[in-house]
């Protein structure tokens, strides 16, 4: 499964957007043979990052079936795209950089 996140959103929404995208894609295409095989065997999710311009290009019909994920707490802003599971994705989508988790310095104790 391939998920594209839009760069420039609040970083705290990236994990939520990815999770929502993966679930939305699975529920939409769960009866598809490749999706079923992916869920039963592989279950890898490739999460890519796209500039706003690349994100718009990634929404193009030529890249196949997709769902655009919006975030209500950001006023309905589009934050992610999930694509139907395929054997291989178009070169443009593969060329996008992987999303990298940014480590923060969090308090060691809550309270």
Q: Model-derived features: where do they sit?
A:
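Positively charged, small/polar-rich N-terminal and surface patches that mediate targeting and assembly
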Residues: 1-111
């Amino acid at each position: 499964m391939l998920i594209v996140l839009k760069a420039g959103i609040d970083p705290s929404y990236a994990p939520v957007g990815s999770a929502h995208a993966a679930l939305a894609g699975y529920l939409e295409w769960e009866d598809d043979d490749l999706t079923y095989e992916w869920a039963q065997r592989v279950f890898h999710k490739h999460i890519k990052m796209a500039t706003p311009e690349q994100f718009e290009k990634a929404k193009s019909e030529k890249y196949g079936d997709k769902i655009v994920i919006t975030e209500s707490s950001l006023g309905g802003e589009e934050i992610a795209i999930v694509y139907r599971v395929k054997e291989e994705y178009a070169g443009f989508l593969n060329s996008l950089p992987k999303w990298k988790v940014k480590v923060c310095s969090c308090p060691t104790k809550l309270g």
